[in-house]
């Protein structure tokens, strides 16, 4: 359920200008992507995602609010954030850079799902490795499809942090100390043709 009320002093942002309304999503309900969020995702995924199909849920994906704190779940093409982590617009000027990167990580799972990748199933088999599942190492012989679903999410998030936000402090993979050109190399196949299913994890 969306409540839309007129308010004064709404901030604009670099992705969406001229907004005069603010949407409020009730816990247990969802909202569509904002225009600013779509612009964020477009910087990487272009038109490979049907953005109208994506919903952002306010509340745990799991029963009894069992979703871990500071954890989002995107198993079915929709994002599920705990109540305290949910934002009405991840592109807003007031949003922390790290949360924008987090949003891009989750959009990677949306992209994977819409291209036919079984995010729910592979999520069970990949995340069982714990933090190691998310950490990546860039090597000359590896390209985007050589990384698992969570590593891909972090690669996209860090690319966005460095190349779009231009803020190293917003990177998700804290072990990353390489040059921006290394991320360019790894993401090149995805950026060139985000509709190509060959970019999905092997």
Where do the model's predicted regions map?
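Hydrophobic or amphipathic, alpha-helical segments that drive membrane association/targeting
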Residues: 1-39, 43-64, 68-69, 85
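Alpha-helical membrane-targeting segments
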Residues: 1-11, 61-70, 74-76, 116-133
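Metalloprotease/metallohydrolase-associated module, dominated by Zn2+-dependent proteases
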Residues: 21, 33-38, 42, 48-49, ...
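Short, aliphatic-rich beta-strand segments
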Residues: 24, 77-82
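Short pre-active-site segment immediately N-terminal to the catalytic Zn-binding motif
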Residues: 47, 66-72, 81-104, 143-145
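Short, solvent-exposed loop/turn segments at secondary-structure junctions
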Residues: 59-63, 79, 85-87, 108, ...
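Active-site recognition of the HExxH zinc-binding catalytic motif
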Residues: 101-113
């Amino acid at each position: 359920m969306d409540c839309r009320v007129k308010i004064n002093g709404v901030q604009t942002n670099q992705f969406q200008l001229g907004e005069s309304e603010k949407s409020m999503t009730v816990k247990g309900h969802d909202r569509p992507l904002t225009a600013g969020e779509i612009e964020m995702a477009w910087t990487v995924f272009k038109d490979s995602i049907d953005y109208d199909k994506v919903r952002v849920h306010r509340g745990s994906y799991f029963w009894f609010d069992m979703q871990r704190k500071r954890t989002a779940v995107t198993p079915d093409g929709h994002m599920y954030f705990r109540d305290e982590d949910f934002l009405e617009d991840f592109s807003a000027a007031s949003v922390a850079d790290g949360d924008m990167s987090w949003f891009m990580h989750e959009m990677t799972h949306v992209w994977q799902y819409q291209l036919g990748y079984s995010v729910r199933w592979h999520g069970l088999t990949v995340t069982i490795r714990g933090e190691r599942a998310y950490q990546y190492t860039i090597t000359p012989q590896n390209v985007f499809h050589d990384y698992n679903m969570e590593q891909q999410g972090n690669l996209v998030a860090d690319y966005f942090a460095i190349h779009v936000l231009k803020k190293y402090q917003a990177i998700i993979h804290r072990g990353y100390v390489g040059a921006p050109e290394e991320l360019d190399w790894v993401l090149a196949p995805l950026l060139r043709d985000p509709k190509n299913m060959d970019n999905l994890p092997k």
